[in-house]
A protein has these predicted regions:
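Glycine-rich, positively charged N-terminal anion/phosphate-binding segment
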Residues: 14-85
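Alpha/beta enzyme core
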Residues: 84-93, 124-177, 185-194
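Active-site-adjacent beta->alpha loops and helix N-cap segments on the catalytic face
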Residues: 47-48, 103-126, 177-189
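Hydrophobic faces of well-ordered beta-strands that scaffold small-molecule active sites
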Residues: 9-12, 36-38, 67-71, 94, ...
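Glycine-rich beta-strand-to-loop/alpha-helix junction loops that act as flexible
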Residues: 97-100, 173, 200-205, 219
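Conserved radical SAM core fold
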Residues: 41-45, 73-76, 99-112, 172-177
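Conserved small/polar residues in nucleotide/adenosyl-binding loops
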Residues: 208-212
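Non-catalytic positions within long, well-ordered alpha-helices that form the structural scaffold/packing
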Residues: 27-28, 87, 161, 213-214
Length: 219
């Protein structure tokens, strides 16, 4: 039962803030997190990780922590190529960013913008999950409820449930909410109950009483 399980806490990524220097300082000075997610890596076609991205994921910069690299892309081949590169550095779990609400990201149909293309997202996950399973790697997904309406999540969850996701990290807002408005906890509850993968909460941490009653993971 959930009440008998220890709540796990993850450090959510924040671009320009939660790089390896911050992660190491937090890990040394405060209560260690169960997982640390990197600020998103944004692969370019036929290109390796940038110096800045590589510096952030180097094992020697992340000792003693369970670190999960996060990738922001809508191109399966770019995701897979980057996952292979990360595997060479010892990583076995990768997170897909489907939550970023930034206008410059969404306009390219990445992050939360990818949620508006469910058929393309389905094909992306089919290709990525097939390749990663063969590589012995695991995929987790960070998602919102939808692009403009929480009603979109019913169809999105059907897509997610087709694949062997390690975790589904659910931010119960839509893209147009950005980080404002009240998290849609009924929708989160539906996602928690309906997901084949373990569900992790992401959003306003002031809702801890509701999170603890439903969930074992907080991001």
């Amino acid at each position: 039962m959930i009440s008998d399980m220890k709540m796990k806490y993850y450090m959510a990524p924040m671009e320009g803030l939660t790089g390896y220097i911050y992660r190491n300082a937090y890990h040394a000075c405060y209560h260690p997190m169960d997982k640390y997610f990197t600020p998103f890596l944004s692969p370019k076609a036929n290109s390796s990780l940038s110096f800045r991205e590589l510096n952030d994921i180097l094992p020697e910069h992340n000792q003693g922590m369970y670190v999960v690299p996060q990738i922001l892309t809508n191109q399966a081949e770019d995701f897979i190529r980057t996952a292979k590169e990360l595997q060479e550095y010892g990583y076995s779990e990768i997170n897909l960013n489907l939550g970023c609400p930034s206008g410059t990201v969404v306009s390219k149909y990445k992050g939360a913008g990818f949620l508006g293309l469910p058929d393309s997202l389905d094909r992306f996950l089919d290709e990525v999950c097939g390749k990663m399973e063969g590589m012995g790697m695991e995929l987790s997904v960070k998602t919102r409820l939808g692009l403009v309406s929480p009603d979109e999540f019913t169809g999105l969850l059907e897509i997610y449930n087709r694949y062997p996701l390690k975790e589904l990290i659910l931010h119960p807002r839509v893209r147009t909410d950005y980080y404002k408005n009240t998290p849609n906890m009924p929708a989160f509850g539906s996602g928690f109950d309906g997901s084949r993968a373990p569900v992790c909460y992401n959003g306003a941490v002031s809702y801890t009483h509701l999170i603890h009653s439903r969930c074992c993971y907080c991001y």
